[in-house]
Amino acid sequence: MSKRTFQPSNLKRKRSHGFRARMATVGGRKVLARRRAKGRARLSA
């Protein structure tokens, strides 16, 4: 039996998908801009 691939960790989640991580790169800022334009309630993890 193989283990499940998703092993939740809030720290890793925030570091890779959090708001600060998004703001750190140009691509991430574009992601936030797209999500704002779409009207998302939550912009990032």
Swiss-Prot record:
Residues 1-10 have a biased composition (Polar residues). It holds the Pfam family Ribosomal_L34. PANTHER family: LARGE RIBOSOMAL SUBUNIT PROTEIN BL34M, MITOCHONDRIAL RIBOSOMAL PROTEIN 34 FAMILY MEMBER. One of its GO terms (biological process) is translation. It comes from the Bacteria. One of its GO terms (molecular function) is structural constituent of ribosome. Keywords: Ribonucleoprotein, Ribosomal protein. Residues 11-20 have a biased composition (Basic residues). This is Large ribosomal subunit protein bL34. Residues 1-21 are annotated as: Disordered. GO terms for cellular component: ribonucleoprotein complex; ribosome. Belongs to the bacterial ribosomal protein bL34 family. InterPro entries: Ribosomal_bL34, Ribosomal_bL34_CS.
